[in-house]
């Protein structure tokens, strides 16, 4: 990349850079991101699924003109999937080639087979690649899904941003990654890891912010439709659902309604498109019919003086 890299110079710069990527952020999140960049500290983002935590990392990488490296966490995640592993298939082919040419020697074979040609770099190793001319954005997504043992390894990595591979040596970098860690709080993350990070709780947006998100992402949406969609989603989040719709569902629903040439909400079209907002049959059954009309009526009163349910 030829563009000179530099962190934002102010909180307002953070908001402006993200706005250029169609991501609308409140001041609290902008402050957390600014300090994370300024102090070179990981940022721990916690909140319910669907509030837009992952999108923050994507938008930040685009805004800074750098790479996004994502590590999706899951139960059983270990060093082979997160840091590196050897390409055993290529190593076996190399051994057979050595045997065919008669050039196999135990000492040289061991040295040749364990060099970077056969190394598969996983996200954490990619993030400290020595060839980078600027920090990457490293997203460690849904850490609460991983085992506690992985947290211990991650804590060591965040301490000095270096990884040692016994057969090769130690990898380090002049440009440590910008680290964002997300959690849906399905379990508590160890305090030792949290202490190393800055922390920010990400809420569902209130009416005004979500309306701004919709109109920014979908500038061709009819104003009345955007207002009604936002108000209906805000009311829906106050209903006892198994899975509350997130911001991405709001955008998807508005997009679908535009594809249906809707300029305003009607009970029938809401019922026809419930599957875009809700992903469980129990939730759809709960909302279908008369509840739709009630939610639609209440949503007309939504506006800047009322807020959606905080997560």
What does each model-found stretch correspond to?
Residues 1-311:
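C-terminal regulatory/interaction module of P-loop NTP-utilizing enzymes
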């Amino acid at each position: 990349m030829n563009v000179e890299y530099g962190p934002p110079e102010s909180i307002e710069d953070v908001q402006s850079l993200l706005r250029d990527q169609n991501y609308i952020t409140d001041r609290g999140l902008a402050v957390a991101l600014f300090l994370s960049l300024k102090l070179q500290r990981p940022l721990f983002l916690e909140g319910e699924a669907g509030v837009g935590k992952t999108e923050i990392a994507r938008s930040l990488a685009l805004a800074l003109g750098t790479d996004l490296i994502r590590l999706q966490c899951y139960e059983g995640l270990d060093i082979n999937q997160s840091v590196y592993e050897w390409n055993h298939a290529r190593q076996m082919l190399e051994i057979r080639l050595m045997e065919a040419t008669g050039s196999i020697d135990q000492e040289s074979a061991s040295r040749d087979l364990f060099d970077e040609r056969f190394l598969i770099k996983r996200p954490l190793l990619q993030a400290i690649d020595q060839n980078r001319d600027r920090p990457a954005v490293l997203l460690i997504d849904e850490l609460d899904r991983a085992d506690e043992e992985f947290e211990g390894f991650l804590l060591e990595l965040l301490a000095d941003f270096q990884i040692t591979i016994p057969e090769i040596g130690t990898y380090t970098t002049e440009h440590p990654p910008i680290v964002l860690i997300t959690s849906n709080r399905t379990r508590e993350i160890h305090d030792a890891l949290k202490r190393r990070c800055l922390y920010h709780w990400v809420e569902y947006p209130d009416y005004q912010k979500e309306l701004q998100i919709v109109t920014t992402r979908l500038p061709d949406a009819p104003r009345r439709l955007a207002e009604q969609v936002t108000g209906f989603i805000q009311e829906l989040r106050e209903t006892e659902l198994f899975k509350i719709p997130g911001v991405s569902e709001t955008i998807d629903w508005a997009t679908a309604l535009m594809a249906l040439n809707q300029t305003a909400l009607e009970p029938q079209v809401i019922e026809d498109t419930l599957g875009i907002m809700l992903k469980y049959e129990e939730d759809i059954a709960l909302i279908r019919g008369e509840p739709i009309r009630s939610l639609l009526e209440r949503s007309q009163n939504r506006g800047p003086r009322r807020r959606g349910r905080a997560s």
